[in-house]
Structure formats: structure tokens, C-alpha cells
Amino acid sequence: MLALCFRAGLARYAIAAREVVEVLPRVVLRPVVHAPAAVQGLLGFRGMLIPVVDLVNLLDGGVCPARLSTRLIVVQAPFFSPARTGVRYLALMAEGVTDLIKSEQTRPGLKISAARYLGEHLVDIDELPQLIVASEILPESLSELFCEVDEGQA
């Protein structure tokens, strides 16, 4: 498996390369007033507005630092509205996005019902990065928030 590694706080995580649409540098985002702390803003991407979620905030409770290695990882995520089908884009802000790694062995981690996005660990890589399942990353509260963005681009 090929995976893109990043950091959230002190832990190392990865997203399967097949889930990554594009990796972008950190750019100025359109702020969203009164949004939850994990929502960094909206990004213009391929003629659409897509939400940007701070993975450090979501996974660790901190704030993603502004470093040269901070990137926006654009992934596909399912529509949040039951009336819509297909996929949409979502940008995940992460730090330390510098390594594309190949791993041959994965092992399950702890199953945490509140964190369905946490996947298996890459056991043949230093620091045992844990896979993030992009389609499960948004908690229900954020999924509901983005329904309106989905509907506005129909």
C-alpha cells in the first residue's frame, strides 16, 4: 500500500494514496464565521467551494501550525445529503506532509466507535502511522454543516 504521511500533534498518521486527489500548499482560505474550531474555511477548488478541516484540531485538539510542511490534502468524501449520491471534495489541513511511504503490513488498532475514521496501523514503518479513512473523517456535526455547501453546488 502506498500512503501519504502527516503529523497531528505528536502522532504520525497516513492516508492511502488512492484516496488523495491532490496535495496543495497552504493558501489563504475564505473564513467561515461561527464555524466549529476544526473548520478552517472554504477553498476554491476546480470551480467549487470545498470545506477545509484542520486534522490537528480534529485528531489532537490543537491547531495546525503554519509550517513549510503544512499542506491541504484534497480527498473525495461521500455527499452528506441523502438526496445526493456520488462524491464530493474535502480538504484536510495537516502538518508534516512530506513522505509518501510504501507499506506491506498493516494491523488493526483499537476500535473506537467515536473515531470510525481511525484505520489500521502500518507496522513496518517507524512510529507505526495509523491510517485515516477519509470517507469517515467528518463527525456528524460537521457533516450536517456541509450539507448546505453540497446543496448550493448542485
Language model segments and positions:
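An acidic, low-aromatic, low-complexity terminal/linker signal
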Residues: 1-154
